[in-house]
Amino acid sequence: MQTIRILPNIRALLRDGRESEAIDVINAHVDVVAPHIKDDLRYIKSSDPKTSLCLSKIYFVLEDYQQAIEYALRAGDLLVDDGSFYYTSIVYHMMDSADIGGDDRIRDFVLKVIGAEDVDDSLIGYLFSIKAYGLLKEALVKYISDGNDCRRLLDLLISLGEEEGCLKEIYGMLAEIGPGKKPFIFYVIDAYFYLEDVEKVKALIERLVKEDILLCYDVAFYTEDNYSPEIEVADQRVMSILSGEFKKKILGAFLLEKNLTSFKFLESIARTRTHYLGLANSLMNLGTSNDTLYRNNADIFGQSSEWAKFSEVASIGMIHLFNSNPYEILKNYLPSEVSQKEGGALMALGLIKAGTFSEEDTEYLLYFLDTEDTLTPELAYGVCLGLGLINMGSANREILNKLKELSKVDRTLLVEASVYGMGMLGLNSWSVELLEDLRTIAGETEFERVKRAVGISFSLVLMFSEEMFYDECNASNGDFKNYINELLYDKDSIMRANGVLSLGSAFVGTGRLGVISTLLPYINDGDDDVKRAAVIAIGLVCCDDRDLLVGTLEPLSENHNFFVRAAVAVVLGLFLSGTGDKVCTNILEALMYDTNSLVRQSACIGVGFITMQCNPELVPNYKRIIEKLNRLIVDKKESGAVELGAVLGRGLSEGGGRNIVFSVRNMSGITSADRIAGAVLFLHYWYWHPLISMVSLCALPTTVFCFNEDLEEEEIEIPTSSRYNNLLICLPDIKKARRFKQKPKEDKEIVIESPSVLTFGSRCTIKQREECGIDAPAILFVKKKK
């Protein structure tokens, strides 16, 4: 009340031209008098900093923030941090204005203010939002030099950079900062490759050879694991890592030596006379190089014919995944000039040599494409898939032209085979030309198989293409949007399913809620193929976020449509392989008792994935689940579909001698295109069973190694809990023994205790890594102990 009484004095001072005195009085009581003197502001003529600051405060109280900011800027050096509510608020309003863009004076003031602040996540986020890359670069350097873990922050910046179409600027900034310590140096390597500056990677590796050989090994391993570059350096130790020979050698030896596969258990499966014994054997011995069962039971496997035999021979490639001499292994199956033999052997060759870009192997496979007259469907598939696997993601124009020629023949299966090969070659290439070729093939055929293969290839080519949807400077981004939109609204249900799958592939691992909301309505599409594709696509988008994946798909596990329930089961299992996730194991166990055979099959496969390297201590219902799978294998009353699911699920649960999981992340923990391709192809096994072997592209050995400067074995000891025992639950008896025959007792459960200390080459499960704090890739390079 006392303050209100001074209003007449303020007005009198203003009207008498005594502005300075009036401003002093207003400043002392601005919060109260401001609403009452807004009509008297016209008497203020001065524009000096003191008056401007007072006017800013008045307009701030009046909530005219635009005017408040304008006068605050005119106040110049008088606008200082006095701890007042006004100062804090006006700065926040300026930050909002700078974020929107416009007045450079606001931006300069904000940058001046925040330049004096301590660097934290929120400051870096704000600098990114206003595109202040210069200050952002300085802030990042300080943030990292303070010893902060930058991984989560940089991952977020890169994700936002993709979404806002400024990824080039983000990576350019990281490249300018240059390599430092781990883990920042790996982001700089990503930047060099994104900017297509491989020479800088080579120069960095050559410098580290002289300065820090242990860090050099880390960099070389990361580079090979993620980019498989054609970099040559003089140091043979580093070169062995860059070529991939080092990784293949240590992983192959690990899987061979630590193989826990029980051949008695495999023999018990053989006694059930299942048609899928070869599949179970290949999964259980994946990467171990142990094909004893094949060699000892050649008569059983020799009875298969046509596509069944193709699948069995192709799956040999899974067993010898890390073998360095595939021609010796496959010599009895590989075709030659005088004998067509097995096309599956060519696919096996591709699985073993996947991603090597071997010219010798490519030339060998291309020979068969020149024999079109004698080219059988089995051989064509072997050639095309083999070429696609070996040259995956290379976009080799010569090979693509050969496959394009094959796609023009009037033989449906050969066209389908060529399309698969084209998609694998174009993996993650974002090639508009290749997309046009595939669209032409789809438009010229009426066969569902070919159209479906085109859709899978579309999804492979568009993989990880999210940034192209936001990059307005790139002319191709409109093409991508048009391709997918045309497919999403196509009258042909298969093409619609192809569009759904391609959208999920383009945004793989991003967790974009907008994309998920676009995909969810297709769950209610009138066609089952579209429903299934929608679930797979949602799984792809969410595959890097467990909570989002489970939260989105869990409600769909109770969907009225059995195709949706079936797809949910496989997708949850594959993307959470080896985690023993309790929520998902409960979902999948319930689906094992579904009324529909396809759902039960898919649930069996899903639990096979999710229970890998688990036991009853990690998963409470583990025994009940595995015993159910075992009963389904021996129960002859079950349908063939459920039998396939049970055998496949059991093979997966014992996969790789219990030393692997299946993951879309590589050893460095990065979601990689080739592994996503393996997942996409495997998830379409329902349409063509030989695609089951593609799951081997996702195989991830789980171990821990330690090497010194000479790449020699270095002993380590990492304490771990005793919760990771291996439990093998055997199959129940197929039939009861006669009373007068004494049947020898056999243990139905075999336990192999896990060590309490992890040493060099020990199995180290996903859960153990989390428990022991071991970062990917679990290959340590340390100084030699004296």
Curated annotation (Swiss-Prot):
Protein role: Acts as a regulatory subunit of the 26S proteasome which degrades poly-ubiquitinated proteins in the cytoplasm and in the nucleus. It is essential for the regulated turnover of proteins and for the removal of misfolded proteins. The proteasome is a multicatalytic proteinase complex that is characterized by its ability to cleave peptides with Arg, Phe, Tyr, Leu, and Glu adjacent to the leaving group at neutral or slightly basic pH.
Pfam families: HEAT_2
GO biological process terms held by the UniProt record: proteasome-mediated ubiquitin-dependent protein catabolic process; regulation of protein catabolic process
Keywords: Cytoplasm, Nucleus, Proteasome, Repeat
GO MF, any single term: enzyme regulator activity
Chain positions of PC repeats: 311-343, 344-377, 382-416, 417-451, 498-532, 533-566, 567-601
Assembly and interaction partners: The 26S proteasome consists of a 20S proteasome core and two 19S regulatory subunits. The 20S proteasome core is composed of 28 subunits that are arranged in four stacked rings, resulting in a barrel-shaped structure. The two end rings are each formed by seven alpha subunits, and the two central rings are each formed by seven beta subunits. The catalytic chamber with the active sites is on the inside of the barrel.
Family the entry assigns: Belongs to the proteasome subunit S1 family.
Gene Ontology CC: one annotated term: proteasome regulatory particle, base subcomplex
Designated name of the protein: 26S proteasome regulatory subunit RPN2
Subcellular location: Cytoplasm; Nucleus
Top-level taxon: Eukaryota
